[in-house]
Curated annotation (Swiss-Prot):
Family affiliation: Belongs to the fantastic four family.
InterPro entries with a match to the protein in the record: FAF (IPR021410), FAF_dom (IPR046431)
Annotated function: Regulates the size of the shoot meristem by modulating the CLV3-WUS feedback loop. Can repress WUS but is under negative control by CLV3.
PANTHER family per the UniProt record, alphabetical: FANTASTIC FOUR-LIKE PROTEIN (DUF3049), PROTEIN FANTASTIC FOUR 2
UniProt organism field: Arabidopsis thaliana
Domain FAF positions: 117-171
Source lineage: Eukaryota, Viridiplantae, Streptophyta, Embryophyta, Tracheophyta
Ranges of compositional bias, category Basic and acidic residues: 217-226
Biased composition (Basic residues): 207-216
Protein name from the UniProt record: Protein FANTASTIC FOUR 2
Source domain of life: Eukaryota
Compositional bias annotation for Acidic residues: 184-200
Gene Ontology biological process terms from the UniProt entry: regulation of meristem growth
Stored Pfam families: FAF
Tissue specificity of this protein: Expressed in the shoot apex, stamens, carpels and young siliques. Detected in provascular and vascular tissue, and in the center of the vegetative and inflorescence meristems. Expressed in the funiculus. In roots and leaves, predominantly expressed in phloem.
Amino acid sequence: MSLVVCQPQINESFYQKDDMGGLSFLQSMSDITSIAQTKEDKAYVHPMEKRSVSKLNEKSLEMCTESLGTETGSESGDELSLLAFEATTTPRAPPRQLKPQEDTNLPDKTPPMSRNNSFPPPIKFVEDSKYNRMVRWLGEDGRIVVQAIRVSSPPSCFVSERGEGRLRLILTSESSLLSHNHEEEEEEETEEGIDEETSENLEGKSGNKKFSRFSRRCKENGREPKPMLTWKQQQFWVAT
């Protein structure tokens, strides 16, 4: 048989405290303060509350308001109240009245200026003269140069004629155009006289039952086709 002997557990800290002698009560007090500090550290405190604790209370503020020659600061409080009263009774300047701003979105009453979109721009001395000057514009170095040129003869115009199955455009002046129209009128008159004579011959021979065949060449533009005239002006051919 085995025997187990139970020995009492001895607390080392108890012996250490007994060894310290009269300083044991100080150690117990330090233990209590450390426990209290740990509890405070664990408890959450809002930072604003911490700041409020650090601020001065009403009594300390009253003590800070002491002025020279006084100890309690009662007179300084009266002076501060008087200054505050004067500040409230001082008249204030009336606020400025802002002028109403004009509406910039209103339509403009002035009529818009009429612009002449003609190109090239009109020149007075060119407009006055009928056949003495003409306007010519050229492109030089990316710019348009308008020049007034003296012209001795009147400006030319186009005349259209049909001949040999083609349409012919001729540049001619006003004088040649008038003479050309006069010649056409004379040719039409002569053709009308020839037509009247042929109709009379047919009526006279109708009794003998002999009819002469009315032969007439195809005419274009009221007249027979003529060979191309040698015009001095420049001619343009148009294919149809």
